[in-house]
């Protein structure tokens, strides 16, 4: 065992039960290597592990030096929103479909993880967005997002009329099916599908991408990540929502605004030493290949 990481958390809820074999293999291997291991409570229950230290995501964030998320990007997003509040590094083993945020190949995960545990890794900070639904005389409803915050109708698709203010200055109005507000991390997710630009992870920028705008002139907008975005609504309907990473939905009531800003904390995401963002674009998303 080395001094880079002493306590390691195992998290992630796989879509297919067969993926639990990766959790169990990882747990046994880490114990054999002499690490202190904390297993997320639900995973320990599903694996029927006895006399094993377990904890919630928050407890793992408080106690562990490294969290290994086993699953796909959805698992990573769900875990990362909580773990980002704590001083913990996060890495993923891909047991999902795309695995854009989960770097480690399940067939070679232990060797790759061994290198990481020996200190051979790349570390980067990914910022989150904080979304607030608020009105002066009402309590705020707050959530966070690693990828994106999306304004959309709640049940039936229809046009939404809204205004966008950036740092309390009017920027534009729009009639569309919604709006995607994305981090650089999320620029290769839903935002990309809607025609948004790809932002490299180190950029301090936020993109605003219209969803099916009823105009010929709407274009994605890139702004500084220090800006605050306010969404205002004229003719309110009762079914508008904002969703965070397509996992958490906050309803918008009449008279309420939506505020979106950069979070005060960030995700400590680590990768194998040979990680390349542009290689990931190529292998995961079919980015253009080299010609020579």
Curated annotation (Swiss-Prot):
The keyword Kinase applies. Coiled coil: none annotated. Its EC number is 2.7.1.23. Keywords: ATP-binding, Cytoplasm, Kinase, NAD, NADP, Nucleotide-binding, Transferase. One of its GO terms (cellular component) is cytoplasm. GO terms for biological process: NAD metabolic process; NADP biosynthetic process. It is found in: Cytoplasm. NAD(+) binds at residues 73-74, 147-148, 158, 175, 177, 185, 188-193, 247. Its cofactor is a divalent metal cation. It holds the Pfam family NAD_kinase_C. Its main location: cytoplasm. It catalyses: NAD(+) + ATP = ADP + NADP(+) + H(+). GO terms for molecular function: ATP binding; metal ion binding; NAD binding; NAD+ kinase activity. Belongs to the NAD kinase family. This is NAD kinase.
